């Protein structure tokens, strides 16, 4: 029985044949389908086709994330996260320096790298540019960032200005300031929900969490970092506005009305029991709020010394001398309030030279009579009824 070749389907008449994939082949038919080189020692197959080692790994092996070409098993590679790179492809995108193992680098777009020196120098340049354009715009995203975020309408800040004013301000900013660099990044609703949930859990996520969010949402790492920065800034502004509103509400709140003093003074629960509650604890005759006594801390002078019974303490009720006779006592009623007090300079003082004791009225009318006429102080600016408690005081001792 004739044996046919699996490659050319012709009968094999050669002395030697090759058995590949459990089928007979001519020696010349066992070759790579890509480069047509003869496979004498080793071959690789996929979908019934034969490949050499180089072409097989080039087409079906791991690809370099930099050049997107296949990586041969004999090639030296470097790994960054889940990506594999050729040594020549693992370079800084700014200075094209080949990055070595253990060197600090910054990943951009998952397959581009920047060495530490170039990143720090670029950050310093960005800070200078930010300071130069800060007078032109105060938007949350700086114009030097490569990607800028446009949140949904639910995430826009509440402001008192209308949409027309906002559009006009944006046009003025674009005309007066430098043009923004890089495209704007639009965050979809599902991506926004994922970022919001992550912000509630950790307002300041670590690099590992940001990497997970980048894999879940498909967004750039830089976009996620800037979104979290803007969200934290927005939370701080909202807290400041709420605190300012609370202070403003407390400041403009209506003032409390002051209650009259007299109503509280006559409350027996506050001032204690007594017929005349304001002076309920004072045991003595009351001569009104305009009394003014001469005070001698070391005793009265020798020429003016008198016994307690002969000390004249009497208020003037008018100009001139007081004639002997009863003087009607005046007691403040419940509706009357003493709101104006006489100053010390306007209060008449008793003359030290007056003599004659005061005697209580035996009829119990609450008045007083003077035995001889009393000279009064030469002060005609004050006149009025003499204030004296009524008979409800129950005590007529002169002091």
UniProtKB/Swiss-Prot annotation:
Biological-process GO terms, alphabetical: eye development; forebrain development; neuron differentiation; regulation of transcription by RNA polymerase II
A Pfam family that the UniProt record links to this protein: Homeodomain
DNA-binding stretch(es), residue numbering of this chain: 180-239
Subcellular location: Nucleus
Gene Ontology terms, MF aspect: DNA-binding transcription factor activity, RNA polymerase II-specific; RNA polymerase II transcription regulatory region sequence-specific DNA binding; zinc ion binding
Top-level taxon: Eukaryota
Gene Ontology annotations for the cellular component aspect, listed alphabetically: nucleus
First-listed, main subcellular location of the protein, grouped into a coarse class: nucleus
Sequence ranges assigned to domain LIM zinc-binding in this UniProt record: 3-61, 62-125
Composition bias, Basic and acidic residues: 151-167
Keywords: Developmental protein, DNA-binding, Homeobox, LIM domain, Metal-binding, Nucleus, Repeat, Transcription, Transcription regulation, Zinc
Chain positions covered by the region annotation Disordered: 136-185, 301-399
Main function: Probably involved in the patterning of the nervous system, in particular in the early specification of the diencephalon.
Protein name: LIM/homeobox protein Lhx5
Organism classification: Eukaryota, Metazoa, Chordata, Craniata, Vertebrata
Gene assigned in the entry: lhx5
């Amino acid at each position: 029985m004739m044996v046919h070749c699996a490659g050319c389907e012709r009968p094999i008449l050669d002395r030697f044949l090759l058995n590949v994939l459990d089928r007979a082949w001519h020696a010349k038919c066992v070759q790579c389908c890509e480069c047509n080189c003869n496979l004498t020692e080793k071959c690789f197959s996929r979908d019934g086709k034969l490949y050499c080692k180089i072409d097989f790994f080039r087409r079906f092996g791991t690809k370099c994330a930099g050049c997107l070409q296949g990586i041969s098993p004999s090639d030296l590679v470097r790994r960054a996260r889940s990506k594999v790179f050729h040594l020549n492809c693992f370079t800084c995108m700014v200075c094209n320096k080949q990055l070595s193992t253990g060197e600090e680098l910054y990943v951009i777009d998952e397959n581009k790298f920047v060495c530490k020196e170039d990143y720090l120098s670029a950050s310093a340049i960005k800070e200078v540019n930010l300071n130069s354009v800060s007078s032109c715009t105060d938007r949350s995203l700086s114009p030097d960032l490569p990607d800028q975020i446009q949140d949904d309408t639910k995430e826009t800040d509440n402001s008192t200005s209308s949409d027309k004013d906002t559009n006009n301000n944006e046009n003025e900013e674009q005309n007066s300031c430098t043009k923004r660099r890089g495209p704007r990044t639009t965050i979809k609703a599902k991506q926004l929900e994922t970022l919001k949930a992550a912000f509630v859990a950790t307002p300041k996520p670590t690099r590992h969490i940001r990497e997970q969010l980048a894999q879940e949402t498909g967004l750039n790492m830089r976009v996620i970092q800037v979104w979290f920065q803007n969200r934290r800034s927005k939370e701080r502004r909202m807290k400041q506005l709420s605190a300012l509103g609370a202070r403003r509400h407390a400041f403009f709140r209506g003032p409390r009305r002051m209650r009259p003093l007299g109503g509280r003074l006559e409350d027996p629960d506050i001032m204690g029991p007594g017929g005349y509650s304001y002076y309920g604890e004072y045991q003595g005759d009351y001569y009104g709020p305009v009394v003014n006594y001469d005070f001698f801390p070391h005793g009265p002078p020798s020429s003016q010394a008198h016994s307690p019974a002969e000390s004249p303490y009497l208020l003037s009720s008018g100009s001139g001398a007081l004639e002997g006779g009863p003087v009607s006592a005046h007691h403040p009623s419940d509706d009357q309030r003493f709101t104006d007090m006489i100053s010390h300079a306007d209060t008449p003082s008793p003359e030290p030279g007056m003599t004659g004791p005061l005697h209580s009225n035996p009829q119990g009318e609450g008045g007083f009579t003077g035995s001889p006429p009393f000279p009064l102080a030469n002060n005609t600016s004050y006149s009025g009824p003499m204030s004296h408690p009524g008979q409800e005081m129950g005590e007529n001792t002169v002091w």
